[in-house]
Curated annotation (Swiss-Prot):
Zn finger residue spans: unnamed: 3-34
Cofactor (UniProt): Zn(2+)
Note accompanying the cofactor annotation: Binds 1 zinc ion.
Protein name (database record): Transcriptional repressor NrdR
Organism: Paraburkholderia phytofirmans (strain DSM 17436 / LMG 22146 / PsJN)
A single GO molecular function term of this UniProt record: DNA binding
InterPro entries the UniProt entry points to: ATP-cone_dom, NrdR-like_N, RNR_NrdR-like
Keywords for this protein: ATP-binding, DNA-binding, Metal-binding, Nucleotide-binding, Repressor, Transcription, Transcription regulation, Zinc, Zinc-finger
Role according to the record: Negatively regulates transcription of bacterial ribonucleotide reductase nrd genes and operons by binding to NrdR-boxes.
Gene Ontology annotations of biological process type: negative regulation of DNA-templated transcription
Similarity annotation: Belongs to the NrdR family.
ATP-cone domain location: 49-139
Length: 160
């Protein structure tokens, strides 16, 4: 690696450490020509699929957009930032695992809704109301009824 100070072609690694999350390697380097030290970070470059919007246009996957939309839905809700990061990481993992080069925005929205459903029901309803473009109260009621059915315990069978 070139020295950022004198542009010498070869530098020496003095120390390497793996970050706490295991996703990054921090390296301290020294230039033998000018004797200056600097730090580099090494991480895996992930090739996430492009997002195909409803109008057919394509854009790069942007983790920040997913985080921002989840934060908006979770505003003033008791959900930690770490939980949001973990949810987005699960979405990225699913997208990477699919092997697809493109993902439709509708599919991405469904993945976000699934994560929000597990994190906070209020946030899920907020996101769904915008994402699915609710037009009246009955659509809210349908989603709430769906939650009630899913969360009610099964009735015990009677054996004789």
């Amino acid at each position: 690696m070139h020295c950022p100070f004198c542009r010498h072609a070869d530098t020496q690694v003095v120390d390497s450490r793996v970050s706490e999350d295991g996703a990054t390697i921090r390296r301290r380097r020294r230039c033998p020509a000018c004797d200056k030290r600097f730090t580099t970070y090494e991480r895996v470059e992930l090739a996430l699929p492009s997002v195909v919007k409803k109008d057919g246009s394509r854009t790069e996957f942007d983790r920040r957009k997913i985080v921002a939309s989840m934060q908006l839905a979770l505003r003033k809700r008791p959900v930690a930032a770490d939980a949001i990061d973990a949810a987005v990481a699960r979405i990225e993992y699913l997208l990477l695992g699919s092997g697809e080069r493109e993902v439709r925005s509708e599919r991405l929205g469904e993945l976000v809704m699934n994560e929000l459903r597990a994190l906070d029901t209020i946030a899920y309803v907020r996101f769904a109301s915008v994402y699915r473009r609710f037009e009246d109260v009955s659509e809210f009621e349908d989603v709430i009824e769906e939650f009630r059915r899913a969360s009610s315990p099964p009735k015990p069978s009677r054996k004789r």
